[in-house]
Amino acid sequence: MNKVFKFLDDTFLDLGRQFKWTYLPPLMVYVAAGISGLTGIVGTFFVKDYLNLSAAFLAGLGFWAGIPWALKMPLGHLVDLIWERKNYMVYFGATLIALSLLIMYGLIIHTEDMSQIYSVETWFVISVILAPVGYVVQDVVADAMTVEAVPLTNEKGNHYNKDEIKIMHTTMQTLGRFAIIGGTVLVALVNVILFRDVENLEQADKIQLYGSIYIYALIIPLFSRLGVIL
C-alpha cells in the first residue's frame, strides 16, 4: 500500500507541489484546446440531419481542415519572429474560433436568415476551416509560452541550475498534457449530461439544445484570452 501511495505521490501529487503561477498562462490555452471537442457531437448531428453532403466531400473537407496542423512548424517560426506581439496571435486565434462557433450557432438557430446570404453548406465549410486555423495558432503560441513560463531565478533572485531548469521544463510539459486531457474528460462529462434523454425531446427543443452548446463553447476562446491576460 505504501508503494502505491508513493507512486501516486511521486507521479501526480508532486506535480501539484511543483506548480508555479508562471505556468498558468500556457495551461489556460491548453485547457481551451482540451475542451475544443465540446461541439463534436453536435457537429455530427448537424451534418447528418441538415446537410446533404457526400462522404467524398466530407473526406476532402477533412483534408483541408487538417492543412493548418501541417503548417504548425512554419507558424512556430513566425511566432518566434513576432514573439513580443504573441498576445495578438492568441487574440487572432480566439477570434477565428469564436467566429466558427457563432457561424454554427447561426446555422442551427437562424438557418433561413443565414441561407439568404450563403448556402448552408458554404457556411458550414467556412466554419470548419476557420476553427482549426484558430486552434493551430493558439497551440503554437502556447508551446512557445511554455519556455517563457519556466523562471530562471527563484524568489531570492538566485539562478536555478541546469538540472532544476530541466525538471521545471519537464513539469511544465507534463502539466500541459494533463490540462489537455483534463479538458477532454470534462467535455465528455458535459456531453453525457447535456445529451441525456435527448431522444425524447421535440425537434424544436433539440435545435435549441444544439444551438446552446455552441454558445457554451464560446468559453473556449475566453479561456485562451485569459491565458494571455494573466
Where do the PLM segments sit?
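Small-residue-mediated transmembrane helix hinge/kink sites in multi-pass secondary transporters
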Residues: 45, 73-80, 188-193
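Structural signature of the two symmetry-related core transmembrane helices
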Residues: 87-104
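Conserved glycine-rich helix-kink/hinge and helix-boundary motifs of the Major Facilitator Superfamily
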Residues: 27, 59-60, 91, 167-174
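Helix-loop boundary and gating motifs at the non-cytosolic
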Residues: 2-69, 130
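Intracellular loop-helix junctions on the cytosolic face of multi-pass helical membrane proteins
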Residues: 1-22, 99, 103, 108-125, ...
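Residue-level signature of the transmembrane alpha-helical core
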Residues: 27-31, 63, 94-95, 129, ...
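Central cavity-lining transmembrane alpha-helices of secondary-active solute carriers
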Residues: 59-82, 94, 98-99
